[in-house]
Amino acid sequence: MPKIKTVRGAAKRFKKTASGGFKRKHANLRHILTKKSTKRKRHLRPKSMVSKGDLGLVVRCLPYA
């Protein structure tokens, strides 16, 4: 049986935690930042966890994570 390919875009976006979850970065913090408030940018800064509903998709994209 052939090896399953990892989705390379997903491998760059998600990191697996020790407890089995996945860390992710928030969107909307790359450009056009002048119109966004400091509070909004500050809250987008820390990493977040992938939600339970999306976890299956991430696991399927990263078979060896």
Swiss-Prot record:
GO terms for molecular function: structural constituent of ribosome. The lineage of its organism: Bacteria, Pseudomonadati, Pseudomonadota, Gammaproteobacteria, Enterobacterales. Belongs to the bacterial ribosomal protein bL35 family. It holds the Pfam family Ribosomal_L35p. The keyword Ribosomal protein applies. Keywords: Ribonucleoprotein, Ribosomal protein. GO terms for biological process: translation. GO terms for cellular component: cytosolic large ribosomal subunit. This is Large ribosomal subunit protein bL35. NCBIfam families: rpmI_bact. The keyword Transmembrane does not apply. It comes from the Bacteria.
